[in-house]
């Protein structure tokens, strides 16, 4: 289990100066050729997403103005707050900030031949399935994960195991991304 606080994470500026990324975790850890990776990006200007052949990307707008996504003849989509959207990461996708203001989004990328991610917003206590990886990011409220208290802009990632996230207040929102390994793969086999 790895814990993080977005406000304390290192920031990597994009080469095109259109934004910045805070990497949450990769699996296998510290590998350039990852099977899955979670990050938070701040987008300050219109531009294209980086290409990652053989990967799927799920992007979820966390805050800021809506973002219009366009991929040639494949899709046009307006990304709205807390509504995950998946697309192939090997296609050119242009992002346009619709309100002209900076936006922040959560990204999870998975290698298509190894695993698949599912992203959802939780508003109540829940338990994850065992032997799957996952990432949580607190949007608001106070959540208990094991002996750790998580609040706004904090989270955790893990590579296997069963975990309960307990909402400690009457209301709260948490982004949860679950990693499902395809047949023939497991975290132990791919490290």
UniProtKB/Swiss-Prot annotation:
Disulfide bonds: none annotated. InterPro entries: RmlC-like_jellyroll, RmlC_Cupin_sf, Uncharacterised_HutD/Ves, Uncharacterised_Ves. Belongs to the Ves family. This is Protein Ves. It comes from Escherichia coli O127:H6 (strain E2348/69 / EPEC).
